[in-house]
């Protein structure tokens, strides 16, 4: 006896004998999970843009969906100005991703040591 395995992610149909169903399904599920994870990682990476000055920050906020990575001085006034001007707010300051993409705050130009991911709420 045979069955047809229809993959929802690739639209691929494969005929499998009932004796092999358990083995094949385990392989298919692992492959599907890995493919979905890689697709999600690629999507995320393609929706993160770096801004090095305020004009670039505003241009990205107006034209590109996703997150903006930019340096911030830590001053709440800068955060509020960014929110007022662009409707973009800080989303996170990751612990492990503290590379310095610039030495200055994207908003005021003062020395900055915090890498922040910014984004719009939808």
What are the residue ranges of the model-derived segments?
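NTP/phosphate- and nucleic-acid-binding module
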Residues: 1, 5-122
């Amino acid at each position: 006896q045979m069955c047809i395995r229809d993959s929802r992610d690739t639209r691929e149909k494969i005929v499998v004998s009932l004796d092999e169903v358990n083995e094949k399904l385990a392989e298919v599920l692992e492959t599907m999970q890995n493919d979905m994870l890689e697709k999600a990682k690629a999507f995320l990476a393609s929706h993160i843009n770096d801004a090095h000055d305020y004009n670039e920050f505003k241009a990205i906020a107006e034209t590109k969906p996703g997150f903006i990575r930019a340096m911030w001085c830590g001053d709440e006034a800068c955060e509020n100005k960014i929110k007022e001007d662009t409707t973009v707010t800080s989303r996170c300051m990751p612990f492990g991703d503290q590379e310095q993409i610039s030495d200055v705050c994207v908003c005021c130009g003062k020395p900055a040591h915090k890498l922040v991911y910014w984004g719009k709420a939808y």
